[in-house]
UniProtKB/Swiss-Prot annotation:
It comes from the Eukaryota. Binds directly to 23S ribosomal RNA and is necessary for the in vitro assembly process of the 50S ribosomal subunit. It is not involved in the protein synthesizing functions of that subunit. The gene is rpl20. NCBIfam families: rplT_bact. This is Large ribosomal subunit protein bL20c. It comes from Olimarabidopsis pumila (Dwarf rocket). Belongs to the bacterial ribosomal protein bL20 family.
Length: 117
């Protein structure tokens, strides 16, 4: 049986790992086993936080819409606003509504008055 030399493959794998972990602090960027563990942990965190970012932005949009609705001075809650939007079949998602609330409040006032009728 012939001898298999795999030093290059292992070195290439560790080099890739070292490039990934180069920005980590301390032993996390120097020791191979620690780098491996930290890489797994970093990827897990990245995966988890991609979902969290979606939830956080949705919360931010809802907060912005709610703040502008309460500024109108009318006793009109966010959930009634969204409910009336669906009843009138206006297809505006929360992201677009939040942008309108931030950049063009008069437009949101108009939308709100139209769906109240």
């Amino acid at each position: 049986m012939t001898r298999i030399k795999r030093g290059y493959i292992a070195r290439r794998r560790r080099t890739k790992l070292r490039l990934f972990a180069s920005s980590f602090r301390g032993a996390h960027s120097r020791l191979t086993r620690t780098m491996t563990q930290q890489r797994i942990r970093a990827l897990v965190s990245a995966h988890r936080d991609r979902g969290k970012r979606k939830r956080d932005f949705r919360r931010l949009w809802i907060t912005r819409i709610n703040a502008v609705i309460h500024e109108m001075g009318v006793f009109y809650s966010y959930n009634q606003f969204i409910h009336n939007l669906y009843k009138k079949q206006l297809l505006l998602n929360r992201k677009i509504l939040a942008q309108i609330a931030l950049l063009n409040r008069s437009c949101l006032y108009t939308i709100s008055n139209d769906i109240k009728k």
